[in-house]
A protein has these predicted regions:
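Positively charged, polyanion-binding regions of nucleic-acid-associated proteins
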Residues: 3-27
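Alpha-helix C-caps/helix-loop-beta hinges
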Residues: 21, 67-68
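A short acidic, leucine-rich amphipathic alpha-helix
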Residues: 28-30, 64
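Eukaryotic, polar/proline-rich low-complexity intrinsically disordered regions
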Residues: 34, 56, 75-76, 83
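Short, positively charged loop/turn segments that connect secondary-structure elements
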Residues: 34-56
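Short amphipathic alpha-helical interaction segments
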Residues: 49-66, 72
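Short, amphipathic alpha-helical interaction segments positioned at domain boundaries
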Residues: 79-120
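Short loop/turn segments that flank or connect secondary-structure elements
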Residues: 117-255
Length: 255
């Protein structure tokens, strides 16, 4: 069955379907709400939000994800309704426990996906675009700089960084790697961080990070580490506030 409704109704019907089924694949969403074989919208983490969806269906899905109404898994390309776990939480990354949240720069991606990422951010109403950095190519530049970074495994970032922000995609990846449920992952490893009127999930505040293996100086979940860790040292709870990373990260001195 294909739904033929207005924009607001399309969004409402899509959420109703996902809630009733608990999880719905992108292929089924496309069949139900509009297909486009050449369509592909990406989010700001170089992850395909939904291949094969029409523009209208993509807009509705991105809106639901950005509002926290549904949880999108980039691994299984499936939309989940998680009983409001992520409702009312900002999509921006809270990267320091003071002042206002620092947003993830737009398009921290290689150039080949930059254009599609910017289109997705426009559809999301600017979510992920740092209001103090209007240059839309900043993220692409950061990606180029970041490719030159070589970690020295000193462990300082895992010891000094707090809070370590978690987005729904981060939680899903960690859950998949540890082979435990979403709710158990949140209950065991996540905590809410409040900055003024903003709330977001973060790794529970431990020093060093609970996932840091001190004996080997390695991250226990490196393959599924949060985006703020993936983008380190260009993004971190400390560098986001303006502190030069070279002052505490030896490997960042040549960046």
């Amino acid at each position: 069955m294909t739904y033929r409704t207005g924009t607001a109704d399309l969004k409402r019907e899509m959420e109703r379907l996902i809630r009733s089924e608990r999880h719905v694949t992108s292929a089924r969403i496309a069949r139900a709400f509009g297909e486009d074989g050449g369509g592909a919208v990406t989010c700001a983490e170089n992850l395909v939000v939904a291949p094969g969806l029409s523009e209208e269906a993509s807009e509705a899905l991105i809106a639901l994800v950005s509002e926290g109404r549904v949880f999108w898994s980039p691994i299984s390309r499936t939309a989940y309704h998680l009983d409001g776990i992520f409702l009312d939480l900002p999509v921006s990354y809270v990267q320091r426990p003071f002042d206002s949240p620092t947003w993830l720069p737009a398009a921290f991606n290689p150039p080949r996906v930059h254009r599609r990422v910017m289109e997705a951010i426009q559809l999301m109403g600017g979510v992920g675009l740092d209001p103090e950095a209007p240059d839309p190519d900043r993220g692409s530049h950061l990606y180029g700089v970041h490719t030159e970074f070589e970690c020295g495994r000193c462990g300082r970032c895992c010891t000094l960084s707090s809070p370590i922000s978690l987005e729904p995609q981060d939680v899903e990846r960690i859950s998949a790697l540890l082979e435990i449920g979403i709710r158990k992952t949140i209950r065991k490893y996540a905590a809410l961080v409040e900055v003024g009127d903003h709330r977001a999930w973060s790794v529970k505040r431990d020093s060093p990070c609970t996932f840091f293996d001190q004996d080997r100086s390695l991250c226990k979940i490196h393959a599924a580490r949060p985006i703020v860790c993936r983008a380190f040292p260009l993004l971190s709870p400390r560098t986001a506030g303006g502190e030069p990373p070279a002052s505490w990260c030896p490997s960042a001195r040549d960046l």
